[in-house]
């Protein structure tokens, strides 16, 4: 079957989502062609097939004149259907970069410069993990003294001058992020967008020599270009035909992926900048039964930090409990929290634990620590008395708390009393007036213990919950950036394959190229060409025409 369509263009597929529509695709006339053919594979030589196959295909013919084409010296006719025409500069939201001098864009888009910027940012981030962040000046005076500098030169003055004590909001770190973002935008504007613009332009080749110069080239002695177009369309190609010429492509999304990678990296940097300059952070230790206001705890850490309505919310600690391993070590802590508005109405209640925070109005409340607030005891039926527990410093990271119940004249020079020590909320060690061990009691048992004729009952152990509050407007942006980065990185591995064909009498010259999987491309082409039948007898009739 040989159909001459010149100067009209035959398009076998729907408009590609990345292709720019042209005028010749706007108005179409549907023509149904029923073609009954005896088919034979070109590889079969002169042997005829033992069976006949009927092919019925519906194709769309353009009813308007094709766009103006441009012929180059190497036998290539370029069309504007997929990006050649149209107004604008084709650069989208990066058009503002046109006001920059070309020399500045050339410097910013330099690949070694961008790599240097990324390594510098990575080094600063590593330095931020080594240097303690957010400590008091006295801490750095003692840790990095001038009389004994680290590495022979690094003192607290470096930290103070460069702002390394708050690395991720320091001007040097934010400046490097801005410089890297400028390099990414310049590279996208000067390199990636022009490449995509060229890739969107389909082009025809009108000479055998031009097609045979491609990475893959082959000639089918007796084959139809229309059959090749249908086979390519079935394999996912977008197919365009003009007269005896054919152009097909697939995988155009792979050409857009580098731009998507750059945009994703920009999102990550924007999110990180928002986190560093627009967040609030604070921590508080609250005994069970007390409350606090979020705004009293949260402190701004950047010049873009803006408080929200949630800062007026009151947090009430209903109860604090702890879970323990069989060995007695603390395994988990839980805080039953209620959030109340300005009118005292409860708007949210949740029991939080480590790795299970509470979120409200952009504020996240984390369970991070615990403390021992007080012991509630009775003495000879009097009380209860709330005895404040004080932390006792010991070696290592173990916690120990103690309190003292005075006995006798509290105004005497040498006041005696009962000492109580605890390392958690489940057991209390009691010592008598002479400092001798008297026994161990669990607060939940309510069992009395007699010391020097006095009956002591430990009614309750009141713990304090350690909470960390923060607002971070950059988190959703960073998550979106990482998601886009993973997606566009996968898309970038899609091969952008292009195929050209030219009908030269009964012979069909086919060539193609791809930007990835070059070793696999010849096998794919041979697989497709093996499906192209050899036309032995043709009988084409137009059965209907609908305008």
From Swiss-Prot:
Record keywords: Thylakoid included? yes
- InterPro entries per UniProt: Cyt_c_bgen_Ccs1/CcsB/ResB, ResB-like_domain
Q: Name one GO cellular component term.
A: chloroplast thylakoid membrane
Amino acid composition bias (Polar residues), ranges on this chain: 41-63
Q: TM segments?
A: 111-131, 170-190, 256-276
Q: Where in the cell is it found?
A: Plastid, Chloroplast thylakoid membrane
Q: What are the entry keywords? A: Chloroplast, Cytochrome c-type biogenesis, Membrane, Plastid, Thylakoid, Transit peptide, Transmembrane, Transmembrane helix
Q: How does it sit in the membrane?
A: Multi-pass membrane protein
- GO biological processes: cytochrome complex assembly
* Region of interest: Disordered: 41-84
Signal sequence, renumbered to the chain: none
Task: Provide the assembly information.
Answer: May interact with ccsA.
Q: Which family does it belong to?
A: Belongs to the Ccs1/CcsB family.
Primary role: Required during biogenesis of c-type cytochromes (cytochrome c6 and cytochrome f) at the step of heme attachment.
UniProt xrefs under PANTHER family: CYTOCHROME C BIOGENESIS PROTEIN CCS1, CHLOROPLASTIC
Name of the protein: Cytochrome c biogenesis protein CCS1, chloroplastic
- Per UniProt, what is the name of the gene that codes for the protein in this document? CCS1
